[in-house]
Protein backbone atom coordinates (compact mmCIF):
# COMPACT_ATOMS: atom_id res chain seq x y z
CA UNK A 1 0.00 0.00 0.00
CA UNK A 2 1.63 3.23 -1.18
CA UNK A 3 -0.45 5.77 0.75
CA UNK A 4 -1.00 4.78 4.37
CA UNK A 5 -2.17 8.11 5.81
CA UNK A 6 -4.48 10.86 4.56
CA UNK A 7 -1.93 13.34 5.96
CA UNK A 8 0.52 12.15 3.28
CA UNK A 9 -0.32 15.17 1.13
CA UNK A 10 0.50 18.87 0.85
CA UNK A 11 -0.57 21.36 3.52
CA UNK A 12 -2.21 23.67 0.98
CA UNK A 13 -4.80 21.00 0.28
CA UNK A 14 -6.04 21.39 3.86
CA UNK A 15 -5.82 25.19 3.88
CA UNK A 16 -7.85 25.32 0.65
CA UNK A 17 -10.25 22.59 1.82
CA UNK A 18 -11.04 24.63 4.92
CA UNK A 19 -11.98 27.61 2.70
CA UNK A 20 -14.15 25.27 0.60
CA UNK A 21 -15.95 23.97 3.70
CA UNK A 22 -16.65 27.45 5.03
CA UNK A 23 -17.13 29.51 1.86
CA UNK A 24 -17.96 27.16 -1.07
CA UNK A 25 -19.41 23.91 0.34
CA UNK A 26 -21.69 23.34 -2.66
CA UNK A 27 -19.12 23.72 -5.46
CA UNK A 28 -18.94 20.87 -8.01
CA UNK A 29 -15.67 20.35 -9.87
CA UNK A 30 -13.79 18.24 -12.40
CA UNK A 31 -10.06 17.44 -12.47
CA UNK A 32 -8.09 15.82 -15.31
CA UNK A 33 -4.73 14.03 -15.33
CA UNK A 34 -1.97 14.76 -17.83
CA UNK A 35 1.48 13.25 -18.37
CA UNK A 36 3.73 15.69 -20.23
CA UNK A 37 6.48 13.15 -21.04
CA UNK A 38 6.15 12.03 -24.67
CA UNK A 39 6.07 8.28 -25.21
CA UNK A 40 5.61 7.23 -21.57
CA UNK A 41 3.13 4.34 -21.38
CA UNK A 42 1.22 4.14 -18.12
CA UNK A 43 -1.63 1.97 -19.46
CA UNK A 44 0.03 -1.35 -18.46
CA UNK A 45 -0.18 -0.24 -14.82
CA UNK A 46 -3.86 0.76 -14.74
CA UNK A 47 -5.09 -2.10 -12.57
CA UNK A 48 -2.26 -1.55 -10.07
CA UNK A 49 -3.07 2.17 -9.92
CA UNK A 50 -6.77 1.34 -9.38
CA UNK A 51 -5.90 -1.05 -6.54
CA UNK A 52 -3.82 1.63 -4.83
CA UNK A 53 -6.61 4.20 -5.21
CA UNK A 54 -9.07 1.69 -3.71
CA UNK A 55 -6.72 1.33 -0.72
CA UNK A 56 -6.46 5.13 -0.49
CA UNK A 57 -10.26 5.33 -0.30
CA UNK A 58 -10.28 3.00 2.73
CA UNK A 59 -8.25 5.43 4.85
CA UNK A 60 -9.57 7.69 7.59
CA UNK A 61 -7.80 10.25 9.73
CA UNK A 62 -6.37 8.85 12.96
CA UNK A 63 -6.87 10.63 16.30
CA UNK A 64 -3.19 11.62 16.50
CA UNK A 65 -3.37 13.09 12.98
CA UNK A 66 -6.47 15.11 13.84
CA UNK A 67 -4.81 16.34 17.02
CA UNK A 68 -1.81 17.49 14.98
CA UNK A 69 -4.03 19.40 12.54
CA UNK A 70 -5.89 20.95 15.47
CA UNK A 71 -2.54 22.21 16.81
CA UNK A 72 -1.93 24.33 13.69
CA UNK A 73 -2.98 27.90 14.51
CA UNK A 74 -4.88 28.47 11.23
CA UNK A 75 -6.92 25.24 11.29
CA UNK A 76 -10.32 25.68 12.91
CA UNK A 77 -11.90 23.07 15.16
CA UNK A 78 -15.08 22.55 13.09
CA UNK A 79 -12.89 21.66 10.08
CA UNK A 80 -11.01 19.07 12.14
CA UNK A 81 -14.36 17.67 13.31
CA UNK A 82 -15.39 17.35 9.65
CA UNK A 83 -12.12 15.58 8.78
CA UNK A 84 -12.82 13.13 11.61
CA UNK A 85 -15.78 11.89 9.54
CA UNK A 86 -14.05 12.17 6.16
CA UNK A 87 -12.93 9.54 3.68
CA UNK A 88 -12.26 9.69 -0.05
CA UNK A 89 -14.99 8.05 -2.14
CA UNK A 90 -13.99 5.86 -5.08
CA UNK A 91 -17.13 6.78 -7.02
CA UNK A 92 -15.69 10.24 -7.74
CA UNK A 93 -12.56 9.00 -9.56
CA UNK A 94 -12.22 7.09 -12.85
CA UNK A 95 -8.98 5.60 -14.20
CA UNK A 96 -8.90 4.19 -17.73
CA UNK A 97 -6.31 3.00 -20.23
CA UNK A 98 -6.19 4.68 -23.65
CA UNK A 99 -5.28 2.94 -26.93
CA UNK A 100 -2.20 5.20 -27.16
CA UNK A 101 -0.74 3.58 -24.03
CA UNK A 102 -1.50 6.65 -21.97
CA UNK A 103 -4.02 6.75 -19.14
CA UNK A 104 -6.94 9.01 -18.37
CA UNK A 105 -7.78 9.93 -14.79
CA UNK A 106 -10.90 12.02 -14.24
CA UNK A 107 -12.10 13.20 -10.83
CA UNK A 108 -15.65 14.59 -10.72
CA UNK A 109 -17.78 15.51 -7.71
CA UNK A 110 -18.18 17.99 -4.86
CA UNK A 111 -15.01 20.07 -4.44
CA UNK A 112 -15.09 19.41 -0.70
CA UNK A 113 -15.02 15.64 -1.27
CA UNK A 114 -12.54 15.50 -4.18
CA UNK A 115 -9.90 18.10 -3.26
CA UNK A 116 -7.75 15.55 -1.39
CA UNK A 117 -7.36 13.15 -4.35
CA UNK A 118 -4.74 15.02 -6.40
CA UNK A 119 -1.51 14.67 -4.41
CA UNK A 120 -1.82 11.02 -3.26
CA UNK A 121 -3.03 9.91 -6.72
CA UNK A 122 -0.01 11.55 -8.39
CA UNK A 123 2.28 9.94 -5.81
CA UNK A 124 0.62 6.58 -6.55
CA UNK A 125 1.09 6.92 -10.34
CA UNK A 126 4.76 7.82 -9.81
CA UNK A 127 5.54 5.01 -7.42
CA UNK A 128 3.68 2.35 -9.44
CA UNK A 129 5.52 3.47 -12.60
CA UNK A 130 8.98 3.46 -11.05
CA UNK A 131 8.60 0.23 -9.09
CA UNK A 132 7.71 -1.48 -12.38
CA UNK A 133 10.34 0.19 -14.58
CA UNK A 134 13.22 0.35 -12.05
CA UNK A 135 13.18 -2.96 -10.23
CA UNK A 136 16.53 -2.27 -8.52
CA UNK A 137 16.61 1.49 -7.91
CA UNK A 138 20.01 3.20 -7.86
CA UNK A 139 19.71 4.56 -4.32
CA UNK A 140 23.52 5.01 -4.00
CA UNK A 141 23.36 7.45 -6.93
CA UNK A 142 20.38 9.22 -5.33
CA UNK A 143 22.33 9.58 -2.08
CA UNK A 144 25.38 10.89 -3.94
CA UNK A 145 23.27 13.51 -5.71
CA UNK A 146 21.58 14.53 -2.46
CA UNK A 147 24.99 14.86 -0.79
CA UNK A 148 26.17 17.09 -3.67
CA UNK A 149 23.13 19.36 -3.23
CA UNK A 150 23.78 19.64 0.51
CA UNK A 151 27.42 20.49 -0.22
CA UNK A 152 26.37 23.27 -2.61
CA UNK A 153 23.98 24.72 -0.01
CA UNK A 154 26.68 24.69 2.69
CA UNK A 155 29.09 26.87 0.71
CA UNK A 156 30.30 30.03 2.48
CA UNK A 157 27.97 33.02 2.30
CA UNK A 158 24.75 31.00 2.06
CA UNK A 159 24.01 30.70 5.80
CA UNK A 160 20.61 32.39 5.58
CA UNK A 161 19.51 30.46 2.46
CA UNK A 162 16.66 28.13 3.37
CA UNK A 163 15.08 25.41 1.26
CA UNK A 164 11.82 23.53 1.72
CA UNK A 165 10.60 20.21 0.34
CA UNK A 166 7.66 20.53 -2.10
CA UNK A 167 8.18 17.12 -3.70
CA UNK A 168 5.36 14.81 -2.53
CA UNK A 169 3.46 14.59 -5.83
CA UNK A 170 6.43 13.59 -7.95
CA UNK A 171 8.54 11.59 -5.52
CA UNK A 172 10.28 8.41 -6.61
CA UNK A 173 8.68 6.54 -3.72
CA UNK A 174 7.36 7.16 -0.24
CA UNK A 175 10.36 5.44 1.37
CA UNK A 176 12.84 7.52 -0.64
CA UNK A 177 10.96 10.72 0.21
CA UNK A 178 11.25 9.93 3.92
CA UNK A 179 14.96 9.13 3.62
CA UNK A 180 15.63 12.44 1.84
CA UNK A 181 13.75 14.38 4.51
CA UNK A 182 15.55 12.64 7.37
CA UNK A 183 18.93 13.41 5.78
CA UNK A 184 17.97 17.07 5.28
CA UNK A 185 16.85 17.35 8.91
CA UNK A 186 20.19 16.02 10.14
CA UNK A 187 22.49 17.76 7.66
CA UNK A 188 20.78 21.12 7.19
CA UNK A 189 19.13 21.38 10.59
CA UNK A 190 15.58 22.61 10.91
CA UNK A 191 13.89 25.73 12.17
CA UNK A 192 12.24 24.07 15.16
CA UNK A 193 15.18 22.45 16.91
CA UNK A 194 18.47 23.32 18.60
CA UNK A 195 17.66 27.03 18.83
CA UNK A 196 19.88 28.02 15.91
CA UNK A 197 17.91 28.05 12.66
CA UNK A 198 19.10 25.64 10.00
CA UNK A 199 18.87 25.76 6.21
CA UNK A 200 15.99 23.28 6.04
CA UNK A 201 12.83 25.34 6.48
CA UNK A 202 10.32 22.48 6.41
CA UNK A 203 8.13 20.45 4.08
CA UNK A 204 4.79 20.82 2.33
CA UNK A 205 4.03 17.22 3.40
CA UNK A 206 1.86 17.25 6.53
CA UNK A 207 2.60 13.65 7.55
CA UNK A 208 6.38 14.15 7.52
CA UNK A 209 6.12 17.56 9.16
CA UNK A 210 4.32 15.77 12.00
CA UNK A 211 6.70 12.78 12.10
CA UNK A 212 9.93 14.77 11.91
CA UNK A 213 8.89 17.82 13.93
CA UNK A 214 9.49 20.32 11.12
CA UNK A 215 7.30 23.17 9.89
CA UNK A 216 4.48 22.29 7.45
CA UNK A 217 4.43 24.82 4.59
CA UNK A 218 1.85 25.97 2.04
CA UNK A 219 -1.05 28.34 1.42
CA UNK A 220 -2.94 28.13 -1.90
CA UNK A 221 -2.67 26.38 -5.27
CA UNK A 222 -3.88 27.29 -8.75
CA UNK A 223 -7.09 25.30 -8.36
CA UNK A 224 -8.35 27.76 -5.74
CA UNK A 225 -8.03 30.85 -7.95
CA UNK A 226 -9.25 28.89 -10.99
CA UNK A 227 -12.42 27.79 -9.19
CA UNK A 228 -13.06 31.45 -8.35
CA UNK A 229 -13.57 32.07 -12.11
CA UNK A 230 -16.84 30.21 -11.68
CA UNK A 231 -17.64 31.08 -8.06
CA UNK A 232 -16.96 34.82 -8.13
CA UNK A 233 -19.34 37.58 -9.24
CA UNK A 234 -17.57 38.59 -12.47
CA UNK A 235 -14.76 36.87 -14.38
CA UNK A 236 -12.59 40.00 -14.44
CA UNK A 237 -12.88 40.28 -10.65
CA UNK A 238 -12.29 36.58 -9.93
CA UNK A 239 -8.66 36.95 -8.82
CA UNK A 240 -9.58 39.80 -6.45
CA UNK A 241 -12.56 37.73 -5.24
CA UNK A 242 -10.23 34.78 -4.55
CA UNK A 243 -7.82 36.88 -2.50
CA UNK A 244 -10.68 38.55 -0.61
CA UNK A 245 -12.31 35.23 0.29
CA UNK A 246 -8.90 33.96 1.43
CA UNK A 247 -8.55 37.03 3.64
CA UNK A 248 -12.09 36.55 4.95
CA UNK A 249 -11.18 33.01 6.03
CA UNK A 250 -7.66 33.62 7.36
CA UNK A 251 -7.71 37.29 8.45
CA UNK A 252 -4.14 37.93 7.32
CA UNK A 253 -2.70 34.51 8.18
CA UNK A 254 -1.33 32.20 5.44
CA UNK A 255 -0.57 35.31 3.42
CA UNK A 256 1.28 34.09 0.34
CA UNK A 257 -0.55 34.94 -2.89
CA UNK A 258 -0.08 32.78 -5.98
CA UNK A 259 0.81 35.10 -8.85
CA UNK A 260 0.68 33.21 -12.14
CA UNK A 261 -2.90 32.07 -12.78
CA UNK A 262 -3.31 34.97 -15.25
CA UNK A 263 0.32 35.99 -15.58
CA UNK A 264 2.25 38.64 -13.71
CA UNK A 265 0.78 41.75 -15.36
CA UNK A 266 -2.80 40.82 -14.44
CA UNK A 267 -1.64 39.84 -10.95
CA UNK A 268 -0.01 43.22 -10.33
CA UNK A 269 -3.09 45.06 -11.62
CA UNK A 270 -5.20 43.23 -9.03
CA UNK A 271 -2.65 43.19 -6.20
CA UNK A 272 -3.34 46.72 -4.95
CA UNK A 273 -2.15 48.56 -1.84
CA UNK A 274 -4.64 46.67 0.35
CA UNK A 275 -3.38 43.26 -0.77
CA UNK A 276 0.26 44.44 -0.68
CA UNK A 277 -0.21 45.23 3.00
CA UNK A 278 -2.47 42.30 3.89
CA UNK A 279 -0.50 39.47 2.24
CA UNK A 280 2.97 38.48 3.44
CA UNK A 281 4.25 38.00 -0.08
CA UNK A 282 3.78 36.04 -3.29
CA UNK A 283 4.85 32.76 -4.90
CA UNK A 284 6.49 32.39 -8.29
CA UNK A 285 5.53 29.26 -10.24
CA UNK A 286 6.14 30.01 -13.95
CA UNK A 287 8.04 32.36 -16.26
CA UNK A 288 11.40 34.10 -15.67
CA UNK A 289 11.91 34.18 -11.87
CA UNK A 290 14.45 37.02 -11.96
CA UNK A 291 12.18 39.34 -13.97
CA UNK A 292 9.25 38.32 -11.73
CA UNK A 293 11.14 39.17 -8.56
CA UNK A 294 12.29 42.56 -9.84
CA UNK A 295 8.75 43.46 -10.93
CA UNK A 296 7.25 42.45 -7.60
CA UNK A 297 9.82 44.39 -5.57
CA UNK A 298 9.21 47.47 -7.73
CA UNK A 299 5.45 47.01 -7.28
CA UNK A 300 5.89 47.03 -3.49
CA UNK A 301 8.00 50.20 -3.69
CA UNK A 302 5.41 51.84 -5.96
CA UNK A 303 2.80 51.09 -3.29
CA UNK A 304 5.02 52.52 -0.50
CA UNK A 305 5.47 49.07 1.06
CA UNK A 306 8.95 48.11 2.30
CA UNK A 307 10.05 44.97 0.36
CA UNK A 308 12.16 43.91 3.35
CA UNK A 309 8.91 43.12 5.18
CA UNK A 310 7.69 40.85 2.35
CA UNK A 311 8.52 37.28 1.31
CA UNK A 312 9.17 36.09 -2.24
CA UNK A 313 8.71 32.33 -2.62
CA UNK A 314 10.17 30.55 -5.64
CA UNK A 315 8.88 27.07 -6.49
CA UNK A 316 9.06 26.57 -10.27
CA UNK A 317 11.21 23.57 -11.31
CA UNK A 318 14.00 24.66 -8.97
CA UNK A 319 17.46 23.13 -8.75
CA UNK A 320 20.07 24.02 -6.14
CA UNK A 321 22.27 26.04 -8.56
CA UNK A 322 19.20 28.04 -9.67
CA UNK A 323 18.24 28.64 -6.02
CA UNK A 324 21.73 29.96 -5.27
CA UNK A 325 21.51 32.34 -8.26
CA UNK A 326 18.14 33.65 -7.06
CA UNK A 327 19.42 33.97 -3.51
CA UNK A 328 22.43 35.98 -4.67
CA UNK A 329 20.17 38.30 -6.70
CA UNK A 330 17.51 38.96 -4.05
CA UNK A 331 19.11 38.33 -0.64
CA UNK A 332 19.03 41.45 1.52
CA UNK A 333 16.29 43.05 -0.59
CA UNK A 334 13.32 41.02 0.75
CA UNK A 335 12.58 37.83 2.68
CA UNK A 336 13.17 34.69 0.62
CA UNK A 337 11.92 31.11 0.53
CA UNK A 338 12.58 28.29 -1.93
CA UNK A 339 10.53 25.15 -2.49
CA UNK A 340 12.18 22.25 -4.35
CA UNK A 341 10.02 19.45 -5.69
CA UNK A 342 11.02 16.83 -8.25
CA UNK A 343 14.73 17.68 -8.13
CA UNK A 344 14.79 16.83 -4.43
CA UNK A 345 12.54 13.76 -4.20
CA UNK A 346 13.06 12.13 -7.61
CA UNK A 347 16.70 12.60 -8.63
CA UNK A 348 18.20 9.13 -8.90
CA UNK A 349 19.27 9.41 -12.54
CA UNK A 350 15.97 8.41 -14.17
CA UNK A 351 13.82 10.82 -16.14
CA UNK A 352 11.07 11.96 -13.75
CA UNK A 353 7.44 11.87 -14.84
CA UNK A 354 6.02 15.32 -15.56
CA UNK A 355 2.53 14.51 -14.35
CA UNK A 356 -0.21 16.84 -13.16
CA UNK A 357 -3.84 16.74 -12.11
CA UNK A 358 -5.55 20.06 -12.77
CA UNK A 359 -9.03 21.41 -12.19
CA UNK A 360 -10.74 21.83 -15.58
CA UNK A 361 -14.34 22.69 -14.60
CA UNK A 362 -16.19 24.20 -11.67
CA UNK A 363 -19.99 24.32 -11.38
CA UNK A 364 -20.33 23.20 -14.99
CA UNK A 365 -18.15 25.86 -16.59
CA UNK A 366 -14.54 25.61 -17.80
CA UNK A 367 -11.78 27.06 -15.63
CA UNK A 368 -8.17 27.60 -16.67
CA UNK A 369 -4.77 28.96 -15.83
CA UNK A 370 -3.06 31.38 -18.23
CA UNK A 371 0.35 31.13 -16.64
CA UNK A 372 3.59 32.87 -17.58
CA UNK A 373 4.60 29.59 -19.30
CA UNK A 374 2.14 28.70 -22.12
CA UNK A 375 3.07 24.99 -22.00
CA UNK A 376 1.50 24.72 -18.55
CA UNK A 377 -2.07 25.44 -19.73
CA UNK A 378 -4.45 22.49 -19.32
CA UNK A 379 -7.76 23.83 -20.63
CA UNK A 380 -8.85 22.44 -24.01
CA UNK A 381 -11.73 24.88 -24.47
CA UNK A 382 -10.15 27.33 -26.91
CA UNK A 383 -13.12 29.71 -26.83
CA UNK A 384 -12.92 30.01 -23.06
CA UNK A 385 -9.14 30.53 -23.17
CA UNK A 386 -9.60 33.30 -25.76
CA UNK A 387 -12.29 34.91 -23.60
CA UNK A 388 -10.07 34.70 -20.52
CA UNK A 389 -7.19 36.36 -22.40
CA UNK A 390 -9.48 39.12 -23.58
CA UNK A 391 -10.89 39.77 -20.09
CA UNK A 392 -7.46 39.85 -18.44
CA UNK A 393 -5.79 41.66 -21.37
CA UNK A 394 -3.29 38.88 -22.02
CA UNK A 395 -1.79 38.61 -25.53
CA UNK A 396 -2.25 35.28 -27.34
CA UNK A 397 0.83 33.03 -27.36
CA UNK A 398 2.58 33.10 -30.72
From Swiss-Prot:
Major enzyme class: ligase
This protein's UniProt keywords: Ligase, Phosphoprotein, Pyridine nucleotide biosynthesis
One GO term describing the cellular component: cytosol
Pfam families documented for this protein: NAPRTase (PF04095), NAPRTase_N (PF17767)
Gene3D superfamilies named among the record's database cross-references: nicotinate phosphoribosyltransferase
Phosphohistidine sites (modified residues): 222
Superkingdom of origin: Bacteria
Keyword Transport among UniProt keywords: no
One GO MF term attached to the UniProt entry: nicotinate phosphoribosyltransferase activity
GO biological process entries: NAD biosynthetic process via the salvage pathway
Enzyme Commission numbers on file: 6.3.4.21
Alphabetized InterPro entries for the sequence: N/Namide_PRibTrfase, NAPRTase_N, Nic_PRibTrfase, Nic_PRibTrfase-Fam, Nicotinate_pribotase-like_C
PTM summary: Transiently phosphorylated on a His residue during the reaction cycle. Phosphorylation strongly increases the affinity for substrates and increases the rate of nicotinate D-ribonucleotide production. Dephosphorylation regenerates the low-affinity form of the enzyme, leading to product release.
Substrates-to-products reaction catalysed: nicotinate + 5-phospho-alpha-D-ribose 1-diphosphate + ATP + H2O = nicotinate beta-D-ribonucleotide + ADP + phosphate + diphosphate
Biological or metabolic pathway of the protein: Cofactor biosynthesis; NAD(+) biosynthesis; nicotinate D-ribonucleotide from nicotinate: step 1/1
Family: Belongs to the NAPRTase family.
Family annotation (PANTHER family): NICOTINATE PHOSPHORIBOSYLTRANSFERASE
Protein function: Catalyzes the synthesis of beta-nicotinate D-ribonucleotide from nicotinate and 5-phospho-D-ribose 1-phosphate at the expense of ATP.
Protein name: Nicotinate phosphoribosyltransferase
Organism of provenance: Acidovorax ebreus (strain TPSY) (Diaphorobacter sp. (strain TPSY))
Amino acid sequence: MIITSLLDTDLYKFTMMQVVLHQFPGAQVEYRFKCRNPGVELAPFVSEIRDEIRALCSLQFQDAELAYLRSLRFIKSDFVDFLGLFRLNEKYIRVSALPSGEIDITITGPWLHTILFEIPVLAIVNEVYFRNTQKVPDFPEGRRRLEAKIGQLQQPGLDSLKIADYGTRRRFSRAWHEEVLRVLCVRLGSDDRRGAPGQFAGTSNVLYAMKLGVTPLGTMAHEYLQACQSLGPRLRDSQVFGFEMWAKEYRGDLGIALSDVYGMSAFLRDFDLYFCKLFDGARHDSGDPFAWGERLLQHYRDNRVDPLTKTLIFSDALTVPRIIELYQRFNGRCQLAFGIGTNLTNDLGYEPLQIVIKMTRCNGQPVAKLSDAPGKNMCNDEKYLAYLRQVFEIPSPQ
